[in-house]
């Protein structure tokens, strides 16, 4: 007898086999986006959506001359377009298996610029709530990475005050979206100002001066030139701030500072995970690879995921998110899904399926 088993993506139906009069059942396959133990995150821009006509992207900009010519109303219109496109991107991410997304700091352009008329979030509150509602519905994590001009450890009070204003803006956006504590804001340690030990001490002192809404979301990332992973862990233990481990910055720092001794990357994982556990926040890592140009430049794609990151859920019993910092954005993530299918959040089944994550993501 012939093997008459058949699977199709079409809707369920009955098909008659003309020769032997056997009945087939055509099975409908469901695709569901579920949270995974290791999730890959998209940074700010989507190449696929940016190529649409009209383009979909949440980081429109506006130069000062245009603001002066057209006024604050035009600025708000472009911000509204940013937010409308952000809503579309959250839905797109869910359909394409992406559960973590870094928001662009350009979402509200010139929000902290003292040279233009100040404006409130009132005109955008409904859209902010819509973004947050969609992210919470899908159990997606939204984060920020404020620019490197945010310098908590600066010895200059005026620059520190500007940093406060900038970080408050990012915190306010996440708060208006209704996002929980896993929606963090990542900053680097900043410059060393000629004395690393004095700067680390000042960083801790200034951190305690930050508004509570900023401290609730701020996390510290190692960089390739100033703050090593050891420095970040030291600061973390003093002020109880979570540490984001950037794998590429770790390797670059070792190249640029051959006089310093480091253990293998996996050695630091327990301290890093503990920094998040103390605050009850899901751990977050950054992965990138060297591209063309100076040390630290990002490549188009990621060829290899570090083994010590992939084994965290099984070894430590903790689920983690990993931002993919590659120039090809979502295309780099899809390439990794092909190489590491266990990372793909899209699950195909003949039954509707929903997995409950082990930890709360918001």
Predicted features, each with a name:
Residues 232, 240-251:
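Conserved mid-sequence domains
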Residues 184-199, 292-300:
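Glycine-rich phosphate-binding "P-loop"
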Residues 29-141, 148-164, 168-179, 209, ...:
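Alpha/beta catalytic barrel-like cores
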Residues 5, 21-24, 30:
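Aromatic (phenylalanine/tyrosine) cluster motif
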Residues 217-224:
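Catalytic beta/alpha-barrel core
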Residues 3, 11-20:
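Polybasic, lysine-rich low-complexity intrinsically disordered segments
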Residues 192-194, 225-227, 249-252, 258-259:
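Short, catalytically relevant binding-site loops at active-site mouths
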């Amino acid at each position: 007898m012939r093997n008459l088993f058949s699977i199709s993506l079409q809707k369920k139906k009955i098909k008659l086999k003309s020769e032997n009069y056997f009945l087939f059942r055509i099975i409908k396959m469901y695709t569901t986006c579920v949270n995974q133990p290791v999730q890959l995150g998209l940074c700010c821009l989507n190449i696929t959506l940016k190529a649409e006509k009209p383009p979909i992207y949440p980081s429109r900009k506006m130069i000062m001359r245009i603001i002066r010519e057209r006024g604050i109303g035009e600025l708000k219109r472009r911000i509204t377009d940013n937010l409308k496109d952000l809503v579309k991107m959250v839905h797109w991410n869910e359909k394409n298996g992406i559960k973590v997304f870094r928001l662009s700091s350009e979402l509200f352009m010139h929000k902290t610029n003292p040279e233009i008329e100040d404006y409130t979030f009132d005109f955008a509150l409904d859209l902010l709530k819509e973004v947050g509602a969609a992210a919470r519905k899908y159990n997606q994590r939204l984060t920020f990475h404020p620019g490197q001009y945010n310098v908590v450890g600066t010895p200059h009070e005026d620059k520190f005050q500007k940093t406060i204003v900038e970080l408050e803006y990012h915190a306010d956006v996440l708060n208006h979206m209704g996002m929980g504590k896993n929606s963090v804001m990542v900053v680097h340690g900043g410059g060393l100002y000629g004395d690393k030990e004095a700067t680390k001490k000042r960083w801790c002192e200034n951190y305690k001066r930050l508004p509570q809404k900023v401290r609730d979301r701020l996390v510290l990332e190692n960089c390739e030139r100033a703050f090593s992973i050891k420095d970040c862990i030291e600061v973390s233990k003093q002020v109880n701030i979570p540490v984001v481990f950037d794998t590429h910055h770790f390797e670059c720092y070792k190249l640029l500072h051959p006089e310093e001794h480091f253990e293998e990357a996996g050695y630091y994982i327990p301290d890093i995970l503990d920094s998040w556990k103390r605050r009850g926040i899901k751990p977050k890592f950054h992965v990138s690879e060297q591209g063309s140009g100076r040390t630290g430049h990002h490549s188009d794609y990621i060829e290899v995921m570090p083994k010590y990151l992939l084994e965290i859920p099984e070894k430590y019993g903790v689920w983690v998110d990993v931002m993919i910092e590659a120039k090809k954005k979502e295309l780099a993530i899809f390439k990794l899904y092909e190489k590491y299918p266990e990372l793909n959040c899209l699950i195909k089944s003949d039954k509707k399926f929903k997995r409950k994550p082990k930890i709360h993501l918001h």
